[in-house]
Amino acid sequence: MMYSDVDETILRKNLKGLSVSNPSLGEKISQAVLDSRAAENASDAVSTSAPASNVPSTLTSSSSFEIKTSKTGLPVLVADGIALHSLMDPITESKRLLDGLKKEDEERVFLFFGAGLGYVVQETLKFKNVTAVWMEADPEILRYALSLFDYSELLESGKLRILLTPLLEQDLYAAFRGISGFPISFIPHRGSNHWKKDSYEELRFIAEGFFHKKDVNISTLTRFERIWTRNFISNLPELADMKPIVSLFGVCRGKTDILVCGAGPSLILSLDEIRIFRNNYILIAVDTALMVLWNAGIDPDLVFSVDPQALNTKYLEGYTGSARIVFDPTSSYHSLRLPGTFKNGFFTSSPFPLIRILSSKPEEEIGAIDFGGSVSTNAVSLAEKMEARNILLVGQDLSFPDKLAHCKGAVLEERLNHIESRKFRREYHNHKQMTALPVKRARSIRGGELRTNEKLLIFKKWFEDHPKKNPWFNFGKDGVVLEGIPGANFAEYIQKNECDPKTVRSVRDRILQIADEPAHARTAHKIENELKTLFEQLKGFSEKVTRGRILSERLYSQIRAEDKFKDQILKNLKEMDGIDEEVSSRKGLTEILGMSIQRTVLMITEGYEGGLTLEEKKNERLGIAKKSLLLYQGLEEACKLHSKQIGKAIARISDPKFET
């Protein structure tokens, strides 16, 4: 690593390297660094001709910086009088910081919260298996670091990745693309923490939150990939008789409140008030809360269902009220096969490419609901789209008040009556739910703190950060405080916010009228034709995929014993290129199949669940062959799954006994 005085040429070379590895992120950091330099130059120019008190605040820096020289002759950045590195020997200091960390056993990521001029980053990147991610809180620090040392090759190769506040979620995803599956070491920088402890601790909190959320997302993807596909295809015959959710958008016209009812433990405390004031609002219940409300004599207007698990159907069993379901196409297919008029409801759009079977313009013709990760966030988003006057929340505890994981009387609790045994008590089941994820604490509505977890805090953040077009109020009597959403007393709110019951009744009648409109026969016919076309396309495609899988297996074996099969490898590679080209050209099919092989995709791109063995990582050609094999194995399984489910759906929708 070459060192010179602060050099514009080196700075621009580094900024160019940033833009090569990640253009959008590179441009953002480049602009911030150049802006900080321009502000400093302008401040210097103004200060020579005006008193300090007259210098505009936008041009003055809140910190002062200078470069000193260590006893070993290396530059040391001093910020506000605090040296960010050892004034004796910055290199030795950096080596000591890395002592004890595993570096050579496998691919790893070292995540630095501040690095000063980057000595510790330079030492890290001497290890070939380590990728460094440098999170920085101040553009001035980066400007000095990138002007003193040439990091351009490391930046272009992706061995070094830099992040600068303010950080967006997509910045983090971009920086960790391809490496988030590797073991990650969090490394705070002593000098930076000594200078601005709060700023650099915040970087650590941001990183922790990002990885927790990413873990939750990956866990969900890999757990439900096949279930989502099966449910979506199996639901298609029933969806033909349902209405797109867009038909409810704007139905309230800003004249009627909507109460969104979650199934938190505190819901039981609000049942009497919900019943008393039932005629003053439209009621959307999440499916887990339905039977709690129904058994209390409360019938909602809409029931939102998004869970793909078969257990989800239990929440709807035995319901005979007049509410209509709002259904995500990937929800459990058993739900739409239950008896009852609630099924004559509405379906939402979906990010699944299969949604194009229902509409070529799903967001416009079906209607998109904002996904916050839970059924409650979806229900609130629907209330917004319906143009509620105010959005009222109840049962959104997002925590475990009174050491409970769910509302008393919920279906999940009632099912324990059937499976409870001496060794499996309901208290133990409740404890398992509370301890499934690491414990977190959050401020309680009742004062003090409540036990929660990272997953629930993700939903809490959605409620708090989601842009609010109309006022939101939290009627919950327990649970965490939702910052920015005022708490309210049910009775007092109703007194202060008069609502004509006739208007509410009119909206309720309109919802039922839309739901009960006869379905077009051509909808079912269109779905049947689309499925038959897709079924035929999969036949030819699966043959190519199977050939690709066989060839990938052969190539993998031949590359492992390369000396014996050199001529055959070249021949097979040529055939493999042709198959790759043909498979990749079928973008529509690969998009559809790709959603059901997310585990495989993550193994290839992120190293999820190990991905490659140490031997495959060391041998680049063997690693490529293994990734090819994993991909074709995944595609072959996906073809079989889709063909099987589509065949069943065609048989059902074309059967004269099937009534849409």
Where do the language-model regions lie?
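N-terminal donor/sugar-recognition subdomains of glycan-related enzymes
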Residues: 1-261, 265-282, 291-295, 299-300, ...
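Glycine-rich phosphate/pyrophosphate-binding loops
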Residues: 136-137, 289-290, 297-307, 383-407
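Short acidic, glycine/proline-enriched helix-loop-strand junctions
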Residues: 151-155, 320-324, 402-429, 448, ...
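Glycine-rich beta-alpha junction loops
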Residues: 168, 397-402, 409, 476-480
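Generic beta-strand/beta-sheet core signal
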Residues: 262, 286, 306, 328, ...
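Extended, hydrophobic alpha-helical segments in both membrane/secreted and soluble proteins
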Residues: 283-289, 325, 379, 395
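Active-site/ligand-binding-proximal alpha/beta "capping" segment
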Residues: 334-398
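Active-site gating loop/helix substructures
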Residues: 343-364, 413-450
